[in-house]
């Protein structure tokens, strides 16, 4: 595995790989790698002959009261995990390399970015999608793999890649969960043992909603309210949002219609740690 820090060098390597007819897959991360990230690499390797991983803690997608400086950066450990997972190139630029003096461009992802995570974290999606487009330009991939856990992020990336005719295939990877159902996340390390136990309520809320949908209920707003009450039953759990949305547009929905795809989405603070989770389903 080759480690590269310079965007121009990475771009030259990617262009050379394309000239050699190598099919390139990219996995973008902020480091602090866990099983969820490694599952993205595995999926990328199943589709691409060459896999590039990026590690960049992007300051422009963190809000003023968020955990940019607290965010874990165990680079040596991450590099070892990437190497053992079969990554071919690890691109790890500095903030100065990505945003040099005079940098002024940003992308507005549109209305989908103003709801839910966008409302809770103003500016987050603009910063996220701008760096994604930059990294696509640097790594020149045919395929990019993103996790379904960040479902709104995935929907926005698909929209922007389509709207801007970028030409990269965007592949969503299933959520990887711990044995008790908690979605893997770099932020799980912030949870105390008691909070870690309470955090399983996110998955319990998903299981409850699935059970109610399986009863052919269509009243999604009511089911979401019941699931939120379950979340609030934990003493340190405080939902930012919990509702059903159209899977493509992330517009809130109150009633299920046969033949449509929906997603239950939630963001919940467990103590001081904010966790997200979701569940996608086709209503038949």
Curated annotation (Swiss-Prot):
EC category: ligase
Name of the protein described by the UniProt record: Pantothenate synthetase
Summary of the function given for this chain in its UniProt record: Catalyzes the condensation of pantoate with beta-alanine in an ATP-dependent reaction via a pantoyl-adenylate intermediate.
Subcellular location(s) per record: Cytoplasm
Coarse class of the protein's main subcellular location: cytoplasm
The protein's assembly and partners: Homodimer.
Keywords linked to the UniProt accession: ATP-binding, Cytoplasm, Ligase, Nucleotide-binding, Pantothenate biosynthesis
Residues given in the record as (R)-pantoate binding sites: 61, 153
Catalysed conversion reaction: (R)-pantoate + beta-alanine + ATP = (R)-pantothenate + AMP + diphosphate + H(+)
A molecular function GO annotation: ATP binding
Pathway note: Cofactor biosynthesis; (R)-pantothenate biosynthesis; (R)-pantothenate from (R)-pantoate and beta-alanine: step 1/1
One Pfam family from the record: Pantoate_ligase
Amino acids binding beta-alanine: 61
Record CDD domains: PanC (cd00560)
Coiled coil: none
Note: The reaction proceeds by a bi uni uni bi ping pong mechanism.
GO biological process, one term: pantothenate biosynthetic process
């Amino acid at each position: 595995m080759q480690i590269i820090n310079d965007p121009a060098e990475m771009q030259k390597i990617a262009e050379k790989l394309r000239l050699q007819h190598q099919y390139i897959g990219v996995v973008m991360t902020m480091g602090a790698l866990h099983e969820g990230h490694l599952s993205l690499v595995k999926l990328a390797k199943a589709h691409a002959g060459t896999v590039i991983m990026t590690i960049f803690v992007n300051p422009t997608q963190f809000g003023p009261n968020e955990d940019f400086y607290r965010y874990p950066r165990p680079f040596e450990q991450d590099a070892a995990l990437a190497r053992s997972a079969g990554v071919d190139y690890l691109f790890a630029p500095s903030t100065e390399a990505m945003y040099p003096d005079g940098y002024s461009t940003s992308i507005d992802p549109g209305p989908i970015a103003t709801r839910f995570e966008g409302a809770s974290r103003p500016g987050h999606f603009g910063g996220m999608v701008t760096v994604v487009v930059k990294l696509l330009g640097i790594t020149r991939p045919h395929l990019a793999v993103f996790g379904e856990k960040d479902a709104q992020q995935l929907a926005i990336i698909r929209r922007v890649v389509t709207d801007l005719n970028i030409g990269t295939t965007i592949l969503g990877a299933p959520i990887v969960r711990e044995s008790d159902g908690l979605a893997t996340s770099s932020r799980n390390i912030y949870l105390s043992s008691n909070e870690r136990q309470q955090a399983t309520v996110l998955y319990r809320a998903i299981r409850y909603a699935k059970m109610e949908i399986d009863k052919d209920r269509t009243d999604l707003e009511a089911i979401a309210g019941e699931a939120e009450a379950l979340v609030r039953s934990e003493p340190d759990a405080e939902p930012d949002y919990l509702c059903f949305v159209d899977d493509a547009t992330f517009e809130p929905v109150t009633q299920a219609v046969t033949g449509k795809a929906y997603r239950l989405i939630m963001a919940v603070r467990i103590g001081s740690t904010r966790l997200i989770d979701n569940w996608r389903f086709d209503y038949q």
